[in-house]
Regions:
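Extended hydrophobic leader/signal-anchor segments used for secretion and membrane insertion
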Residues: 1-472
Length: 472
């Protein structure tokens, strides 16, 4: 009996420390059950051990499976989870096929908004393609105290901010819903002869025009359920996980000039393995062994074959430039792409290489609101902080029914970008990342396998157990 009391004391102490950490005394209702498991044993928790035949066999597996799923749920929620790099947006810092150990403790775990969810799923049950969570109960955002805060140039895992709305047809689920709506709306207005030159409009006229573009695109998608399915929404913690580098902190003013990120007027150090696309002409076929040597993937070569541009690090660019036998010409791709940049509901003249300046919202700080800067901050005010925002025909801004000339933010925001700068869907395209979307910090790469080389030959031994903080 003394052993049981000792076990109970240890488990109870650990559980109470956990409750102090998460600041949730509601969990005290579990204490009597812990006491019963170790001491009183009034509830026959493992009744199936008294049974014979298949019942005992089946229930032993059910018991083990339930225990494993519950353990995984709490470990993933409060301590760490696995994340695999699905795309090339952070190459060549993090590579497609890198498996990351992501710490929830580094920035503090979030109390789940949707606690009733199937472990090991993000939002959809595999095979059956139905929601893996229920939306009740829905808890407000709260973050448990962690070891620190997001720092400049940290690589961060977060929920995709623009993933609040999407269409549930599987072919389009990976598409940015808002970009899709504006793109379709713009095409339809061109076809109907309703397209106008937004550069000649004042901010209020632009607002009305883009409202029409958005409504046209949304109405079209809504009218085509056979093609797009239904328009659905997802709570914050059920949105897709993204991983990018934080290049702008709350309260900083960010501007991109000729591809370089400036913060408060000072150039931020580029990542060592930053990539841009280059226009290149070859004299012959690209040797596979040279591609492997320079870290050029099949995806990179496919892009080159389709468009004549290829993403390269500075090291790879210099090596190819010096290879006169192979390369006829090579130069950085300076094509200015205007479309689909954030904000989608205004014309700014910004490009992916020359963007801003934008002030990154900081909790407790205020900004004067004008029709010119409203498109940049409207989503923060309406969607992320839950306010009702309207603009009347006279151009006056109303927040929650009251005229507003300024706004004080309730959350901190961050600016995230991929190191593969010309091939990354990041804050330049969907805006700020609110603090309640931050998931965790990658600590190290525990496994890495190249999708270009199947089997044993694809294992990247040199990347195993590489600390992410050392990838600058």
């Amino acid at each position: 009996m003394k052993v049981q009391w000792a076990k109970f004391a240890v488990v109870l102490a650990l559980y109470l420390l956990f409750l102090v950490w998460v600041e949730s005394w509601l969990g005290l209702i579990v204490v009597p059950f812990i006491f019963d498991v170790y001491i009183t044993k009034k509830i026959h928790w493992q009744w199936w051990k008294d049974e014979e035949g298949p019942v005992r066999f089946i229930m032993s597996w059910v018991d083990a499976l339930v225990f494993a799923l519950v353990a995984v749920y709490f470990i993933n929620l409060f301590f760490f989870q696995n994340y695999v790099i699905p795309s090339s947006s952070l190459e060549k810092s993090l590579l497609t096929g890198d498996y990351l150990f992501v710490s929830k403790v580094s920035y503090g775990p979030r109390i789940p908004e949707t606690p009733l969810t199937m472990p090991l799923t993000q939002h959809t049950m595999p095979l059956v393609n139905v929601k893996s969570y229920v939306e009740w109960p829905h808890w407000d955002y709260r973050r448990v105290k962690g070891l620190g805060n997001v720092k400049l140039n940290d690589i961060v895992v977060f929920n995709y901010p623009a993933g609040d709305t999407l269409v549930n047809e599987e072919r389009y689920q990976a598409n940015d819903y808002y970009q899709m709506v504006y793109s379709i709306g713009d095409q339809l207005m061109q076809q109907n002869g309703q397209e106008k030159d937004v550069r000649a409009m004042n901010p209020l006229q632009q607002r009305h025009y883009f409202e029409q573009v958005y409504a046209t695109g949304r109405n079209y998608i809504s009218s085509m359920p056979g093609e797009y399915g239904d328009i659905i929404s997802r709570p914050t913690d059920r949105r897709e996980n993204y991983v990018k580098r934080c290049v702008g902190l709350p309260g900083q003013t960010l501007q991109i000039k000729n591809r370089i990120v400036y913060l408060n007027g000072k150039a931020n150090k580029e990542p060592d393995n930053v990539q841009y696309t280059y226009k290149m002409k070859l004299k012959g076929e690209f040797p596979i062994d040279l591609a492997d040597e320079l870290g050029i993937t099949n995806e990179d070569l496919l892009m080159y074959n389709q468009s004549g541009v290829i993403p390269l690090t500075k090291k790879a660019y210099l090596a190819l430039k010096a290879n006169r036998n192979l390369v006829e010409s090579i130069s950085i791709n300076t094509d200015a792409t205007y479309g689909d940049l954030y904000p989608l509901n205004a014309y700014t003249g910004w490009t992916r290489d020359n963007y801003g300046p934008v002030w990154i919202p900081k909790k407790g700080e205020s900004i004067a609101l004008t029709l010119k800067n409203l498109p940049v901050y409207e989503r923060c005010i309406k969607v992320y902080e839950g306010n009702d925002l309207k603009v009347d025909n006279a151009g006056r801004i109303f927040i929650n029914g009251k005229q507003a000339k300024s706004y004080t933010f309730k959350l901190d925001y961050y600016w995230m970008m991929g190191d593969n700068r010309h091939n990354s869907a990041d804050s330049r395209y969907w805006g700020f990342v609110p603090e309640d979307h931050i998931v965790g910090k990658p600590i190290f790469i525990w496994w890495s396998h190249s999708p270009d080389h199947p089997g044993f030959s694809g294992i990247r031994w040199n990347r195993l157990f590489t600390f992410v903080d050392n990838i600058k």
